[in-house]
Amino acid sequence: MRQSSRLLRLLAFTSSVLACGLCLAQAPDPDGRATPAQRAAAGIGAPVQPLPAASTLAAREQKTRIAAWRTEVRRQLFVPDHLPALEARTWSTFSPTPGVLADRVTYATADGMLVPAIVYRPDPKLLKPHIKLPGLVIVNGHGSDKFGWYAFYSGMLFAKMGAVVVTYDPIGEGERSAVKASHTGEHDAWVSPPAGLPRTDWGQRLAGLMQVDAMQAVSYLLAQPEVDATRIAVAGYSMGGFITGITGAIDTRIHATLLSGGGDYDGPGGYFDSNPLPCQTSPYKSLLPLGDRGAVLYALNAERGPMLVMNGSADTVMDMAHHPPAWFDEVRTRALALIGPSSPAAKNIFTTVLYSDISHRTSWVDRKGVVWLDRQLHFPLSSAERIATEPTTHIGDWVKTNHVYLAEAYAREDREAGLDALGTGLPGIPREDLMALPDADWQRLQDRLTYAAWAGKTRAAEQQAASHSTERQ
């Protein structure tokens, strides 16, 4: 995986997509992190030299370039050429609300690990015979997991509309934490790789695991006979939006992607390059060989299918002050040039929703988000007319009434608490009901579940890679 790809070598006869005249605005700390002062001054980062427009390339060259970009992203993030065997197992099933079943599931991901998930689906008794259902993957924000309110609210909401919805624990959270807790931040630790490896290596491997987590959730949906392979979407929030934007760029099995609270893939030294989290800074820096990373990622998503980016103008988490509509318009123009304004993919170029005076939140459960998802997925137990008039639930009131946890920082009207989510009468789900594995099995499988177990395997993989690097010198 770490060797130069054949496709990248083929690009030598084009305008050399990887040689783009990049100039880093600020030098990072030795471990790859920006200093606090650099983060504060990051803005949108340094300008990038535009890549050759699609109009300057022959059709064969353009096809090769698209494939090469995808190969390079996978290579940098250690995403294997072939995903692992799914190993899907349903441990048990329960009904969190009438009309919805929830399967407690595990499936395999990268590095021999397992992902615990809750998969929501409509009760078969409500479905017409042989009907095909859309699939939806929810990718959580930083610190959250399948126990988070928006994960299980989304699961019930969209299952009631006729979708199969996968919610899962990111590495280090929920059942992938040694203490089975949420908001642990276990994967936030910066780990310096052995000498001879890039300082970003650990974060690249961590991000690759997160990519395969999401891609295998798609694989799980595709393995279900009732799921329509042409109607699969992935929705990601915050860190999950960062993951989803990259997943959508490399996984063409996905039809639609929705990013809420994110999408600001900017220039060298900008938001993600100066982010303090190894799951974002390191992988984004590793994509510098692409050149205009934001335009390339958005172009690849357009080649795959539709994409919606939802943000609030007052979102300080994602630094929307430096990423106003004009910034998104500019990156959209550059992405369109990379695919060709008249190409079939141009119709899929990302669109945006910007809420005035709103901060960080999961907007795919509000009316605009659900309307867009319905246009892509065609929920069989709902309709455009019903969605337009569906009553809503004010999340701030709902979490109090149902004793659902919401972090204090997000229990604000301009953040998650202020959401008016579609649907009424959905319950809170007790934490114990959202455990995928029986405790005895979780104890037995810890070496395939927890961040600590993954970290041990990854340290060994890095040592081996460093040894091979030394031998080649």
Over which residues does each language-model region extend?
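Boundary at the C-terminal end of the N-terminal hydrophobic targeting segment
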Residues: 23-25
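Bacterial N-terminal signal peptides that target proteins for export
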Residues: 2-12
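Alpha/beta-hydrolase-fold serine-hydrolase catalytic core, especially in secreted/extracellular enzymes
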Residues: 27-103, 108-114, 305, 329-473
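Proline/glycine-enriched tight loop/beta-turn segments at coil->beta junctions
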Residues: 112-115, 123-135
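The feature captures the conserved acid-bearing segment of alpha/beta-hydrolase catalytic domains
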Residues: 266-336
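Primarily recognizes the serine-hydrolase "nucleophile elbow" in alpha/beta-hydrolase
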Residues: 216-289
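Cap/lid segment of the alpha/beta-hydrolase catalytic domain
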Residues: 129-212, 269-270
